[in-house]
Amino acid sequence: WITPVVQNASGYDYHGYHASDFSKVDCRYQSGDGKKSGDVMFQELIDKAHAKGIKIILDIVLNHTGNFGEEHFCKEFDRDTRLRNQADINACMIPNLETLGSDYPGLQPGYQYQRRLAMMKNTDGQNHDTHNYWHHFGNFNWDLPNRWWAQIAGDCVDLNTENNTVADYLVKCYGNFIKMGVDGFRIDTSGHISRLTFCKQFIPQFAALGKQYEDKRLNKAPFFMYGEVCARFGSVQYRGQDNLSPYYYTWKAPKDLMDGFDGSQSYWDTQEIYDSGTGYDAKLMPLCEKDNADSPESNNTFMLNGAWHEPDYSQSSGFNVIDFPLHYNFSSAGSAYGLAKSGDMKYNDATFNVVYVDSHDYGPQPSDGIRFSGSDAQWAENLSLMFTFRGIPCLYYGSEVGFRRGSVIDKGPNGPLSNTGRAYFGGYITGDVEASDFGEYKASGNVEATLNHDLAQHLIRLNKIRQAVPALR
């Protein structure tokens, strides 16, 4: 997947997860001469990828905005897109003094942050967010359902996705990308939104748009959605709780809870909520926490008596997930395989799990803050399992050469990116590649050396095997 492309704003927003305007592509994606907007350039990317038989999976964020407001819900800034240096947040972001106050420019950075936050979630004891576009929840526990309502980081201000106005706006904005032809969504921080909310507010809506605009996608393939239900834990069930486990999101929510879900703006306008209080509204958040029934099981992933059988998707939510339990056990292929065999019946269909060894966030346990540190032989074994087992293989850039092996993935703003697992990989792929067939090519420049790496060659062979054997796909 490619990381989010909507307009961002923060002091650390290179990755796209701090939205300030969901309705447009970030101005930093405009053409070098400024004649083509980011939206036009992104459409060109989709079209050119499709012309080469490549699908575009777009990372989207439903859970939160950045901490600089949002153009539609709380306009705190104007952006000067004419400035070449868009990384200089103080120069390109012009504060809306009507919203932030005339004294805002003279405040120290920490107080400026608190002022911005107060306008979004009532942290100063005043009811600024009268329509409840954001959640106003204080302390939370990563291992309890109240993680659905809380701000998980200073630059990730939690949206009230139970509010129809918020959900409808997000569906409209991201629906525009479906109309442009993106082939699927990877949905960030899905584990910080309840399953009930997904089933009521997002999955059916995106699925309907996907069906409506199927002609825009490569080969009219079904629109694919999968979520990041983060579970940094060694078992398939997350700390004894079904409703916080990735597999739970692959199943439909109960009909009685769906029928009782009323996120109308007229309701939310009656709620006055502060994070110094309970942080809960009168009915929607408690209703979501009632979605905690035991999860069913399925044999959709398995053959029966050595034969294929028609899968039963009658209880599928239409949503798939990143296989966090498998990812977390990829310290060895044997450990990952054993875990999957013991737990795949918990997913509606684990065939659609997205599987990776490491990512831009985590590596396998026990040291999940670093990129996979194993040898090339260990990498090759893990990749062999990924490409010949159930699920959809996913590679983080550079894994094909063991790039930044063992490096700390995210040091925040405390050091250059070049010293982290998120370092720039572009230098490895400069040069030219001319493909004559699947896995057959001629290359020159740095990319030739990259493709000649032992792991890259192993991946080419695995891809050829997977392409030749339909059962593996």
Model-flagged regions — what are they?
Residues 1-7, 136-142, 337-346, 350-353:
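Conserved oxyanion/phosphate-binding beta-strand-loop segments in alpha/beta enzyme cores
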